Amino acid sequence: MNTQLPTAIIGGGPVALAAAAQLVKRNMPFILFERGAYIASSILSWKHVRMFSPWEFNMDTAAKELLMETGWTAPAKDHMPTGVELVNEYLLPLSQLDQLQPFIQLQSSVKAIYRKGFDKMKTAGRDTASFIIEYEQHGKLLREEAASVIDATGTWLKPNPMSTSGHPAEGEIQNKNHIQYGIPDILGADKQRYAGKNIVVVGSGHSAIQSLTLLNELKLENPETTIHWVLRKKKVAEAFGGGENDGLPARGALGTRANQYVQQGNVQVHTPFLIDRIKKESETITLYGTKLDKAYSIDKIDEVIVATGARPDFSFLSELRYAADTSVESVPQLADLIDPNIHSCGTVRPHGEAELRQPEKDFYIVGSKSYGRAPTFLLATGYEQVRSVVAALAGDFKAAREVQLHLPETGVCSVSRSTEISDNSNSCCTTTPKKMSIRPIAVTSMSSGCCSSNNASTSCETDTGC
């Protein structure tokens, strides 16, 4: 590897910045490309959501060391940050350090990565050729040369569609004005969009339950709000997760909370409903599909929230020799550890550079993108990945091999549970707006103690968002 050239980091989220910090600690040059106007721009799309892992698991060691040198005070390790807190209190100060800020390219969308003078077919001399990063910035196509590449772009920007085929349902694209993907700011910026409306949430994971939590609170304030929950699972109890058995209590509480909403009748469940068509009917839409192999539909729907996961984008890697599992689309050696067809939660053993190694020398896919379509990624895993990868790039193979990772047990995430489980710590409060700011970004979050959007947790722990 040409040590005079920088390592190119693609992405500007927590794992990407951790990679930068690790490179700084080893006095290795880097250049980082963030497609958004601000660092960690994808996280700001779920700024209102509280993570279910505390600060202890959300900060990289090398990054903390660099910050501490400036007099920065670390947040309480047992506090669970919201997305805006993650940016405000950690990622933004990190990105503004003198060792990082000059080498961060914002509003830089990477279009292609390839070996200098090589297409995918050519082999002789390939491993010693530098990488070329083609990126668009302010309407111009630019190029940067790099010795190695760390792809930490995550999956947040490529949400899965609502259909079961993996392709958009018929009419899904045409009716996009009625659809939002991920976790909307239901109690904040998007409140008027959902208050008093007939709403469908599609999905069975943490993000779907998070949206149900926020909608349930909205319904307490606006009783005319109607909530439908569409799942592909045969029984709704399969989505309730491990509850008190989960090593992250806030994550376990999500399923308990969802069960409570169903038992109280605040959420109407449709399962297993397989959507294949959406049709506009006057000012509303109708969802068509099958339930237990029979035609089924839900009509007069105002809004749909699709929380069916996300997938990696490989389009800009077409001239590199990369490998991805054929089903999970993860780094191949991780597939059997995280495949949701095999594991309900995916507690993954510690792994590093050796498992992440690609056919293309000095190219690595890390962070949530390394997990492909699997939904169980935690930031602490990504931090250990990049520590090991950077050690290998530095030639410190001993450190790269010594992979150690402390994670909470994920608990039992797919079990048969009694439908009588409930959470007595239900609604208790009303929301009070609180103004928060990130230099130079102004945002508004909701804070209300035990039942605001700040109290509900999710699995938004990806490198560019969640």
What residues fall within each predicted segment?
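Extreme N-terminal leader/targeting segments of oxidoreductases
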Residues: 1-7, 25, 122-124, 157-187, ...
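Glycine-rich active-site loop/strand segments that organize a redox cofactor
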Residues: 36-90, 176, 182-188, 229-249, ...
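A Rossmann-like FAD-binding core segment of flavoenzymes
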Residues: 216-325, 391, 397-409
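C-terminal, flexible cofactor-proximal segment of oxidoreductases
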Residues: 311, 326-466
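Feature captures the FAD/FMN-dependent oxidoreductase FAD-binding
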Residues: 73-148, 152-157, 276-287, 300-303
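Glycine-rich dinucleotide-binding loop and its adjacent helix/turn
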Residues: 151-221, 227, 328-336, 345-352
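N-terminal Rossmann-like FAD-binding beta1-loop-alpha1 element of flavoenzymes
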Residues: 4-32, 201-218
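Active-site substrate-recognition segment that forms the wall
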Residues: 54, 198-238, 350-374, 378-393
